[in-house]
């Protein structure tokens, strides 16, 4: 018996062409190219999710560094002072405090300076 798969094949092609709808030129009209670009786009989104974590951490560290330097400490000294003081607060929260609540951030800087002095 011969295998008839027109329905399945059409459904599969339609899925890829629908996903490639916004692509330019032949990439949105030709099945083979649309499928290649679809796979590539999924790879880019996967990699992007990994890079996002690095980028956010860099942003938090930059914000903390700027705020700490305004108070007279380098970023590394500030983090070391917090570790010596036994304060466990993550960089995301510290950067939020540095941006939105400078008074609370100054308290952490004060704690770090006291720990470094002793």
UniProtKB/Swiss-Prot annotation:
Pfam families attached to this UniProt entry: Ribosomal_L20 (PF00453)
PANTHER family tied to this protein: 39S RIBOSOMAL PROTEIN L20
Family statement: Belongs to the bacterial ribosomal protein bL20 family.
Biological function: Binds directly to 23S ribosomal RNA and is necessary for the in vitro assembly process of the 50S ribosomal subunit. It is not involved in the protein synthesizing functions of that subunit.
Keywords tagged on the record: Ribonucleoprotein, Ribosomal protein, RNA-binding, rRNA-binding
Lineage: Bacteria, Thermotogati, Thermotogota, Thermotogae, Thermotogales
Protein name: Large ribosomal subunit protein bL20
GO molecular function: rRNA binding; structural constituent of ribosome
GTP-binding recorded as keyword: no
Biological processes, Gene Ontology terms: ribosomal large subunit assembly; translation
Species of origin: Thermotoga petrophila (strain ATCC BAA-488 / DSM 13995 / JCM 10881 / RKU-1)
GO cellular component annotations of the record: ribonucleoprotein complex; ribosome
């Amino acid at each position: 018996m011969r295998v008839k798969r027109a329905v399945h094949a059409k459904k599969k092609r339609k899925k890829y062409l629908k996903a490639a709808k916004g692509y330019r030129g032949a990439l949105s009209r030709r099945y083979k190219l649309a499928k290649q670009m679809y796979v590539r786009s999924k790879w880019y989104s996967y990699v992007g999710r990994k890079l996002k974590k690095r980028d956010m951490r860099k942003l938090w560290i930059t914000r903390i560094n700027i705020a700490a330097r305004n108070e007279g400490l380098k970023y590394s000294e500030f983090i070391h002072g917090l570790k010596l003081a036994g304060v466990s607060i993550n960089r995301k929260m510290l950067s939020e405090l540095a941006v939105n609540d400078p008074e609370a951030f100054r308290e952490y800087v004060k704690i770090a300076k006291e720990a470094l002095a002793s």
